[in-house]
Amino acid sequence: MQDVIFFDQRPRPDRDQTPRERRYYVWTVGCQMNISDSERLEAALQGVGYSPATRPEDASFIVLNSCSVRASAEERILGKLGELVRVKRQHPDTRIVLWGCMVGPNNRSIFADQLPMVDHFVSPSAVDEVVALAPNPIYTLDEPALPVRDWSHPPVSVHVPIQYGCNMTCSYCVIPLRRGRERSRPLAEIVEEVRRIVARGAKEITLLGQIVDSWGHDLPGRPELADLLEAVDPTPGLLRLRFLTSHPAWMTDRLIETVARLPRCQPEINLPVQAGSDRVLKLMRRGYTVARYKTLIARIRAAIPDISLTTDIIVGHPGETEDDFRQTMDLCAEIGFDKVHIAAFSARPGTRAAEQEQDPALAVPPAVKEERRRRLEQLQEQIATERMARFLGQTVEVLVEGESKGKWRGRTPGNRLVFFSHPADLTGQLVPVKITATSPWSLQGVPQLDDSVNAQSKENGLVKAR
């Protein structure tokens, strides 16, 4: 997964009269997989009769969905649990659940001693198990909950997990220890879930997995991600289809060809390289070389010339020298990624890299990690500035996601953020936008729409005052 995100829910105003005993509070830290899990949980809780609360003290059922990718994420959760001690003291009947990647198979007993305010510890993605702990349900679910918590305003884009767990043994990653081995959801189940989501108003689907390219290898018949894309692409009403996160060892020519051919598959691939040094890649146990990665990038660009390539990089992994880091800088400059998610190495208990960091000869000082992170960010900002400048004067297709600070916000097929002004509510529509200004991180433009759009918007009552 990519960035660590902190996500909180907001209540539906039409349910303000729900008593405290049927209110929940969900607080989520982590990647898009965690956010999707929490959305599905909230939908399920609402389905059994609960409503969201804006504050934990207003809820009888509190769930913290945790992340272990970096120490800072765990610190956020522990800090939140510290705040909940007061809530538990005021309302002893409050039920608190610690959910997600902090809860592994071997640490529940440890947490039970360290975190007495927590009533239950639940492993990642186990939505049904969490729902079963809610103390005051009044309904039962007729069908599986979808990963959308509020259908009163259907989201334009929805992430759909297709796989849980990970079989890789990357030196720095704790996810396999917490989420377990890979488990692929059946193709028919995913296709039906996508159909239900799109039928209710979503326009874009992102298929989600820790190593999304490996989906299906554990299912009967060993289907591939390309097969799933073929099955999802024709969904009526679907405008765009994406997937993440990929792994260089699992990216196949067939998958590349499928992305290039299918009309709704977007020209974007997130392909984490993690380092530009073969020596560091070996320490990381990534399973490929820099040369192999470059060859793969060349094949992708040959098949999909307008591809948007993003990647993840860790700086300061134990054993990384200044020369190793310079090789990473050189790789970024050579490939020219559209976006790079950069993280300084954070030792996670139980991983091989955490053991390596105990060796003074391998450990990279925190100040050096931070300095390398800043240097790489500066380089990537220069690269992104140049790559985004190519769009100046071009007209791009934008799927409008919503409003932000008085402008409409949307994304191009390559997932580049675009802002523009228009009096009509264009949410969920594909809009041609001529780019008039660029920055490293977003584009500004003018919609290329005829007067009939404005007239139709007025007729439908969609024009907003600005």
Swiss-Prot record:
Its EC number is 2.8.4.3. One of its GO terms (cellular component) is cytosol. Residues 389-449 form the TRAM domain. [4Fe-4S] cluster 1 binds at residues 31, 67, 101. It is an enzyme of class 2 (transferase). It catalyses: N(6)-dimethylallyladenosine(37) in tRNA + (sulfur carrier)-SH + AH2 + 2 S-adenosyl-L-methionine = 2-methylsulfanyl-N(6)-dimethylallyladenosine(37) in tRNA + (sulfur carrier)-H + 5'-deoxyadenosine + L-methionine + A + S-adenosyl-L-homocysteine + 2 H(+). Binds 2 [4Fe-4S] clusters. One cluster is coordinated with 3 cysteines and an exchangeable S-adenosyl-L-methionine. Residues 22-139 form the MTTase N-terminal domain. The keyword Disulfide bond does not apply. Keywords: 4Fe-4S, Cytoplasm, Iron, Iron-sulfur, Metal-binding, S-adenosyl-L-methionine, Transferase, tRNA processing. Belongs to the methylthiotransferase family. MiaB subfamily. Catalyzes the methylthiolation of N6-(dimethylallyl)adenosine (i(6)A), leading to the formation of 2-methylthio-N6-(dimethylallyl)adenosine (ms(2)i(6)A) at position 37 in tRNAs that read codons beginning with uridine. This is tRNA-2-methylthio-N(6)-dimethylallyladenosine synthase. The gene is miaB.
